[in-house]
A protein has these predicted regions:
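Alpha-helical interaction segments
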Residues: 3, 58-59, 131
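N-terminal capping segments
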Residues: 1-55
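Active-site-proximal beta-strand/loop segments in catalytic clefts of secreted hydrolases
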Residues: 35, 99-102, 144
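Acidic, low-complexity intrinsically disordered regions
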Residues: 20, 64-66, 136-138
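General "foldedness" signal
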Residues: 46, 111, 133-135
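...with weaker cross-activation on analogous glycine-rich loops/strands in unrelated enzymes
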Residues: 51-127
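Low-complexity, Gly/Ser/Thr/Pro-rich intrinsically disordered linker/tail segments
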Residues: 128, 132-145
Length: 145
């Protein structure tokens, strides 16, 4: 299967923060699903993606979407620590980025954080959340041209 085109993903990426009308507070996986579906090389829907979805058949979880991309479509990502030094290795690249355990949810202590984020990475910038405090336990990166 062909890898998605970064520019096509960028063009298909939703312009709104919460594209789903359901009450999901964190919609990064939904936004990435919409971009993937719009790009056309990788489809996220009920016949291809079995993890939890919103009513529109978009992925709801960042980690489950990242694992699905790894297992079924893009192969093993470059896996980095959350450090600033490691991020420099991808700073001038484009692709899909997954931040593992980058923020605390609800009543979690920061040391027990489990919040994840998936996004487009455009030469050091994302479309939404950015882990500027380098809190991620891991950063996964799939380079796309």
């Amino acid at each position: 299967m062909a890898k998605p085109s970064f520019i096509n993903l960028l063009n298909a990426y939703p312009k709104v923060q919460s594209p789903c009308d359901q009450p999901w507070g964190n919609q990064c996986a939904i936004r990435m699903s919409i971009a993937l579906n719009g790009e056309l090389n990788i489809k996220v829907n009920k016949s291809t993606y079995t993890d939890p979805k919103c009513k529109h058949e978009h992925a709801r979880g960042a980690e489950s979407l990242a694992n699905w991309l790894w297992r079924h479509h893009l192969g093993r990502p470059t896996i980095l620590s959350g450090s600033a030094a490691d991020r420099q290795t991808i700073s001038q690249k484009t692709g899909i980025v997954f931040f593992k355990d980058c923020f605390a949810r609800g009543n979690e202590e920061e040391s027990q954080r489990s919040g994840d984020h998936i996004d487009l990475w455009n030469r050091g910038r994302t479309m939404g959340y950015y882990d500027g405090d380098y809190m991620s336990r891991q950063v996964w990166f799939w380079e796309l041209a």
